[in-house]
Amino acid sequence: MQTADSRDLVLDRLWQHARARPSEPALYQKHSDGEWKALTFADYRDLVHRTAAACVAAGMPEGGSIGIFCENRVEWVLAALGAQAAGGLVSGIYMNSTDDQAVYILAHCEATIAVVDGPRQVEHLLPHLSMMPKLSRIVVLTEPDVASSFVSKPGLVVSWQEFLDSGKGHEQTVDERFARLTPDTLASLIYTSGTTGTPKGVMLSHHNLAWTARTGLSTFQVDRQDVMVSYLPL
């Protein structure tokens, strides 16, 4: 079995950077006050680990999945890497997807967790829960007290902070699953737009993602001084 020191997964790179330069900025996000605020590599790694523990707490098994139905934001990346660190995979859903397409993707990838922007997405998902039998958690990013709006579904609809807090006590399970990851482990299902029928899922392994990252860095000669802007939908 490969260890985290001998593998070269995207997650391994994050763990390495968090050890080597913990206080340097890894991500910037523009907040409502107009200020760009940094997330350091150490905090980035810690939040990914907490998210992974929350995925375990929500019942996501190894090989399980989460669906992300929100705009580009730091939590999108945390949810994706967190699920992968816990041995799961991630499927992104475009914000211009129809409700039927979103439900289809969540059902097809057998998502345990759906991460959504706000209550509107929740309201569109709830009537279709029977089509998504493995869905145990809907995490809402923009409403910190969202659970009070959906009291008929206790524990199903939670805020991002509640989701993170739920992972306490599951850290060792994350570490064990993280150690079992290999380059061939499935990391993502990317769905087509569905213009010619139902969306089709394309399987990508951790090796696929790592190779793409390494190739992009070398092709464009990106170094530590460069800042890249995330513009296209994740």
Residue ranges and their predicted role:
Residues 22-25, 140, 157-162, 168-191, ...:
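Conserved pre-ATP/AMP-binding loop-to-beta segment of ANL
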Residues 5-27, 46:
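A short N-terminal helical cap/helix-turn-helix that marks the beginning
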Residues 58, 85-165:
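Structural core segment of the AMP-binding/adenylate-forming
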Residues 47-50, 183, 202-223:
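Conserved structural elements of the adenylate-forming
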Residues 1-9, 122, 126, 146, ...:
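Flexible, low-complexity linker/hinge segments
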Residues 38-42, 178-180, 187-211:
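Conserved AMP-binding A3 loop
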Residues 23, 27-81, 98-103, 159-164, ...:
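Conserved AMP-binding/adenylate-forming core of the ANL superfamily
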Residues 68, 208, 219-234:
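Conserved AMP-binding loop of ANL adenylate-forming enzymes
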